[in-house]
Curated annotation (Swiss-Prot):
This is Cytochrome P450 monooxygenase sdnF. Glycans are attached at residues 178, 186, 191, 309, 416. It comes from Sordaria araneosa (Pleurage araneosa). Pathway: Antibiotic biosynthesis. GO terms for biological process: antibiotic biosynthetic process. One of its GO terms (cellular component) is membrane. Cytochrome P450 monooxygenase; part of the gene cluster that mediates the biosynthesis of sordarin and hypoxysordarin, glycoside antibiotics with a unique tetracyclic diterpene aglycone structure. First, the geranylgeranyl diphosphate synthase sdnC constructs GGDP from farnesyl diphosphate and isopentenyl diphosphate. The diterpene cyclase sdnA then catalyzes the cyclization of GGDP to afford cycloaraneosene. It is found in: Membrane. Its main location: membrane. Pfam families: p450 (PF00067). Keywords: Antibiotic biosynthesis, Glycoprotein, Heme, Iron, Membrane, Metal-binding, Monooxygenase, Oxidoreductase, Transmembrane, Transmembrane helix.
Length: 521
């Protein structure tokens, strides 16, 4: 059978329209389309009255540029200094910095009207599902919180204190060895970024399973720690293609990074089973752990949920606390007067390091203030945790009407460094947190704009444990050591890049035995 009759229209069409003409026509149509969208976004979009740079209101190019650079947090800070407490930083994305915005976006009353934005913090499972407390579903989130809450209660956290002390004591012993090897006059130059990352990873895995990965003992990152850093980094990259689900799923599947991490988590669970079985045979009582508490829960998690939640706890519990310890130790080193006051408070409270305990540490106001000020200066999540308005008709957020589908958040770095909210916002002054003892010049600071653990239904479930880890670690280090920082050793930290979390810029401190720098305090 002949199909020559199919050839004549094609020949006629392509004889009158060239390929180049088709390409030019397509380009013109696409340009006109994008121009129409830009005009709409600038002149007619419901967010048109929100202040911000004109280009950001019509295009996502500036957003991607600064996100890719790693300096989005500093860019947004400059925008808020220019435009005020509410800024449009993308066609459908709004950044806030006020305390009112914290309550309106993250508060309990809005938990079904404002949900996590999956494009801003995409899942690293190939099908986009989440089986952990970071889930996008408010119903699943409530379920996981209910099961996990007993693991992080005041009673449970107190049971973990022994584990915290054991791990911190290992770090102190390592640092003392290093000082002994070096020249007493110069002390020992220590990369505290690595030490604190190893320590917090050891602590969180020990708290999770009753046994750590021994990063401090081996003085190197366990493969599981390296994978957790890869997971965080990869999630920051995936933001670029989160809107294209097919490509995102392909890249996630191609990397396989979460699967490797979950495999290690599961092997740790199996190891815990073997240890628990041995303890049952010998009658020995095992250490308190999150995993043992989860196994004993009345509504136990299935395997995928167990893997997902333990993965989330390990990554969040080590990454953020390790950085907070690095920041606090660095700022104390950079401000000798602050170091002397913090060290004096700790050393006056305890006759020996063995007496240090968390109940007593809670009563030390300056130690707490030193940590709080470091969390203000360098919040663990500098760019904000995005939420999306999902209710029809929109919502009023901090006095601005925000339509459905808009991504909204409080930019923590911008809020914490705002000159409208803080006196000397870029300087480290723990005394601003001392309540009645706060100096006059800091009494108008808007301290409620600082929420390092978020608030409302999504408040960090492990904040009590994190505070214990930070108090015990810093107190023992302040009791044992003096430290300072040399001129160039803090530059990388001061200019660190950040995506979902900060890059690991090395902070090198000069560590000395107690009294070597500042005498008896």
């Amino acid at each position: 059978m002949s199909f020559t009759f199919l050839d004549w229209p094609r020949a006629e069409i392509f004889s009158s329209v060239s390929y180049l003409g088709l390409l030019l026509s397509g380009t013109v149509l696409y340009t006109v389309y994008k121009l129409i969208i830009a005009i709409y976004n600038y002149f007619f979009h419901p967010l048109r009255k929100i202040p911000g740079p004109p280009l950001a209101s019509i295009s996502w190019v500036p957003w991607y540029k600064y996100w890719f650079s790693g300096y989005m947090h500093r860019h947004v800070t400059r925008l808020h200094e220019t435009y005020g407490p509410v800024v449009r930083i993308g066609p459908s994305e709004i950044s806030f910095i006020s305390a009112t915005a914290w309550k309106d976006i993250y508060g309990l009353k809005r938990c079904r009207q404002i949900e996590r934005d999956p494009q801003s913090f995409p899942s690293l499972t190939p099908n986009g599902a989440r089986f952990d407390v970071l889930t996008y579903s408010p119903i699943d989130h409530a379920k996981y919180r209910k099961i996990l809450n007993p693991c992080f209660s005041e009673k449970a956290t107190r049971e973990y204190e022994r584990t915290i002390h054991e791990n911190v004591d290992k770090l102190v012993a390592k640092l003392e060895q290093n000082i002994s090897r070096g020249q007493k006059k110069n002390g020992s130059r220590e990369n505290v970024t690595n030490w604190f990352q190893w320590l917090t990873f050891d602590m969180v895995t020990d708290v999770c399973w009753g046994r750590s990965f021994e990063c401090v003992a081996n003085e190197k990152s366990h493969v599981c720690l390296a994978l957790s850093m890869d997971l965080v980094s990869y999630s920051s990259f995936i933001v670029f293609v989160a809107w294209w689900k097919g490509l995102k799923d392909f890249l996630v599947k191609l990397s396989g990074v979460e699967g490797l991490f979950v495999h290690l988590v599961r092997s740790k669970c199996e190891e815990h089973h073997l240890i628990a079985a041995g303890n049952e045979l010998t009658g020995e009582k095992g250490k308190a752990s999150i995993y043992s508490n989860l196994r004993a829960a009345g509504d136990p998690l299935d395997l995928a949920e167990l893997d997902g939640n333990l993965t989330a706890i390990v990554i969040a519990g080590s990454e953020t606390t390790g950085f907070a310890l690095t920041a606090t130790s660095y700022y104390l080193a950079k401000n000798p007067a602050c170091f002397r006051r913090a060290a004096s408070e700790v050393r006056s409270a305890f006759a020996s390091a063995e007496e240090i305990n968390d109940d007593a540490l809670r009563k030390l106001p300056y130690l707490k203030a030193a940590i709080e000020e470091a969390l203000r200066m360098t919040p663990a999540e500098p760019n904000g945790l995005a939420r999306k308005v999902v209710v029809d008709g929109g919502l009023d957020i901090a006095g601005e009407w925000i339509p459905k589908g808009t991504a909204i958040y409080v930019s923590q770095f911008a809020a914490n460094r705002s000159s409208a909210y803080f006196h000397l916002p870029n300087e480290y002054h723990p005394e601003r947190w001392l309540g009645e003892e706060c100096p006059k010049e800091f009494r108008t600071d808007k301290l409620d704009a600082v929420q390092p653990f978020i608030m409302g239904v999504n408040v960090c479930i492990g904040r009590g444990l994190a505070w214990m880890e930070m108090r015990v670690t810093l107190a023992k280090l302040l009791w044992h050591f003096d430290w300072t920082v040399k001129g160039g050793d803090g530059e990388a930290f001061e200019q660190a890049k950040a995506w979902h979390v900060w890059t690991k810029s090395h902070v090198n401190l000069q560590l000395h035995r107690r009294g070597a720098l500042y005498g008896d305090l």
